Swiss-Prot record:
Protein name: Uncharacterized protein MTH_886
Record GO biological process: pseudouridine synthesis; ribosome biogenesis
Pfam families associated with the record: Gar1 (PF04410)
InterPro entries, alphabetized: Gar1/Naf1_Cbf5-bd_sf, H/ACA_rnp_Gar1/Naf1, Transl_B-barrel_sf
Family: To M.jannaschii MJ0782.1.
Membrane-spanning parts: none
Signal peptide coordinates: none
Protein origin, superkingdom: Archaea
């Protein structure tokens, strides 16, 4: 796992906003320091050098609990990359 960034705040829509030093792949899973999965990367916005990353929490996670964890480091896992392009037909 690679370090994603630090929690900045929780948005009005329940997204966890983190400040990062690099962009991440959309849909990549996000973990806490103890390895618990909290959600996935939903959106990236802001300046290119230090973007903000919006994290959509999993249904089991209450985003209000992260309001008191501001400054905690989050980590990103490796997402399986889907292959783009045309699929070949199977012969019967």
């Amino acid at each position: 796992m690679k370090a994603l960034g630090n929690i900045s705040h929780v948005s009005n829509k329940g997204r966890i906003i983190a400040r990062s030093d690099r962009t991440q792949q959309l849909g990549a899973p996000v973990f806490t320091s103890d390895g618990k999965r909290i959600g996935k990367v939903h959106d990236i916005f802001g300046p290119t050098r230090n973007p903000y990353i919006s994290i959509k929490p999993s249904r089991a996670i209450n985003p209000e609990k992260f309001e008191n964890r501001v400054g905690e480091t989050l980590y990103v896992g490796i997402k399986n990359v889907k292959k783009w392009g045309r699929r070949k037909r199977r012969r019967k």
